[in-house]
């Protein structure tokens, strides 16, 4: 992160922004939680850390004393904190488990809607989140509906397969069933700054995927075999949980579908809107007037079923995304539909 911030400052300076003043008063008012500032490891760039407040059940649709919990899952699914200015700094995997645990403790909650808007994420993070939802259903017997928003691809869709029912919006992008590992060769870029790497290693393949050189044939074969195994696991999970899906290679080649196409192929059970998911959950609970609540932090208010938590640092949004620069901060193999090589949805 420090390298990216420094790069951003240099980029801004060389672009002639020295005469422009950046006002921060509005940014401070947007910070979603109480924060304090510390120095980063090199003692130069500040980091903003938020104080974790307990999750609260915030009503987004009024009703009876019986509740339906709407759990929001947005953005890149990785097992790490997305900390920085303007971000709640949540770990998506940790937060998802925390919300499921709170739902399980609340005896007034009778059903769960998982609202997913995600390109996907790390192979392991996505798999863990799905397993957590499967375990939750096994322990509680509670009905679960997944509603896909703008994007329900890769690991985001993998998570949805753990639900009793999947609903997609008419314009949802569904699919991206595949595995990707992004590697970049920065040898020429480093040479422009007179930087050269010198690696001392014990083990022929221990530096496989290094940005300092291209892969050889053996290395490419090793990584491809791993990707294919992860992809086969993804396919097996879909086929086991979606009985109407046919084992057709054409639909498992990473392509994407509209909500209607996904329904025709059996990847989703219906096409509708979030109100339709709520109505279905109410039917499952036997209470057509059940209250709908979202679990958010005290400083992160939810007033409608569309409420989202800011979980991407403002500084990252202000900087150019350079392929390869984020590689060390992300998982390796990913269940993700990736239209952008920077992997920052």
Kindly give the residue locations of the regions a language model identified.
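Active-site loop architecture of trypsin-fold serine endopeptidases
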Residues: 171-179
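N-terminal organellar transit peptides
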Residues: 2-4, 9-146, 151-152, 158, ...
């Amino acid at each position: 992160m420090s390298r990216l911030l420094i790069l951003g400052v240099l980029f801004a300076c060389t672009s002639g922004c020295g005469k422009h003043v950046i006002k921060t008063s509005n940014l401070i008012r947007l910070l979603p939680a109480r924060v304090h500032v510390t120095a980063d490891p090199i003692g130069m760039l500040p980091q903003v850390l938020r104080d974790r407040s307990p999750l609260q059940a915030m009503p987004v649709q009024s009703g009876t004393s019986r509740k339906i919990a709407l759990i929001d899952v947005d953005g890149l699914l990785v097992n790490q904190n997305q900390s920085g200015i303007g971000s709640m700094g949540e770990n998506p995997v940790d937060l998802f488990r925390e919300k499921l645990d709170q739902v399980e403790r609340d005896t007034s909650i009778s059903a769960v809607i998982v609202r997913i808007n995600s390109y996907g994420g790390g192979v392991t993070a996505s798999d863990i989140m799905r397993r957590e939802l499967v375990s939750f259903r096994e322990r509680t017997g509670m009905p679960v509906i997944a509603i896909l928003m703008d994007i329900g691809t890769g690991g985001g869709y993998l998570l949805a397969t753990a639900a009793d029912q999947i609903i997609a919006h008419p314009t949802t992008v569904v699919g991206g069933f595949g595995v990707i590992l992004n590697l970049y060769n920065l040898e020429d870029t480093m040479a422009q700054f007179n930087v050269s790497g010198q690696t001392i290693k014990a083990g022929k393949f221990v530096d496989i995927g290094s940005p300092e050189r291209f892969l050889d044939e053996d290395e490419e074969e090793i990584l491809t075999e791993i990707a294919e195994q992860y992809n086969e696991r993804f396919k097996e999970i879909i086929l086991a949980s979606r009985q109407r899906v046919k084992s057709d290679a054409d639909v498992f080649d990473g392509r994407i579908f509209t909500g209607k196409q996904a329904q025709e192929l059996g990847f989703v059970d219906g096409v509708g809107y979030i109100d339709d998911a709520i109505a279905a959950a109410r039917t499952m609970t036997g209470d057509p007037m059940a209250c709908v609540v979202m679990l958010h932090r005290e400083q992160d208010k939810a007033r409608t079923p569309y409420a989202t938590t800011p979980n991407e640092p403002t500084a990252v949004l202000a900087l150019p995304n350079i392929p390869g620069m984020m590689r060390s901060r992300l998982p390796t193999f990913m269940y993700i539909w990736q239209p952008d090589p920077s992997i920052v949805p």
